């Protein structure tokens, strides 16, 4: 009887121990799945419209006006009339409806001797009203290489222009001798939009 009692007690203790043990299951961590974007013809861009908007294009051109004499005078008209830069006038501008020149650097490169005298005056005409220089305040010395930068606001570059119309003009006039003085090197940045 005693032996049987011990067995009953042992079984009861084992049963209680089994009931007290927590059940632990090892599970793999669940990672949230990212939805892959499907690229297809029927997908719309974020703008909400059914087509992709084309942003404006930026172009840079460098051209020169050579064989300037000390007494040369003339003008450079920026736009479709810019014959000094065929890639712009006969190229890019014919491929778009609108353009905007945003930056201009006019550099004078001297070729004159150190004993030469005189200067070349220049003037910005943002409204294309003048054909000859009106003011000679701003000038380059014939014997010194210099450059001048014009801001976007100064060159009428805050609005878009039709590619059939010019934007602005730079006039110049020298007061030196009729000898080769140097050349102009012009760098411009042009925005275009609305391709033809």
Curated annotation (Swiss-Prot):
Any one Gene Ontology molecular-function term assigned to this protein's record: structural molecule activity
Lineage: Viruses, Riboviria, Orthornavirae, Kitrinoviricota, Tolucaviricetes
Protein name per the record: Major capsid protein
Gene3D superfamilies xref list: 2.60.120.20
Subcellular location: Virion
Stored InterPro entries: Luteo_coat (IPR001517), Viral_coat (IPR029053)
Additional information: The N-terminal region like those of many plant virus capsid proteins is highly basic. It has been suggested that these regions may be involved in protein-RNA interaction.
Principal location: virion
Presence of the UniProt keyword Iron in the record: no
Alphabetical UniProt keywords: Capsid protein, T=3 icosahedral capsid protein, Virion
Region Disordered, annotated ranges: 27-55
Keyword Amino-acid biosynthesis listed: no
Family listed: Belongs to the luteoviruses capsid protein family.
Cellular component, GO, one term: T=3 icosahedral viral capsid
Function: Major capsid protein.
Gene source species: Bean leafroll virus
Biased composition (Basic residues): 32-44
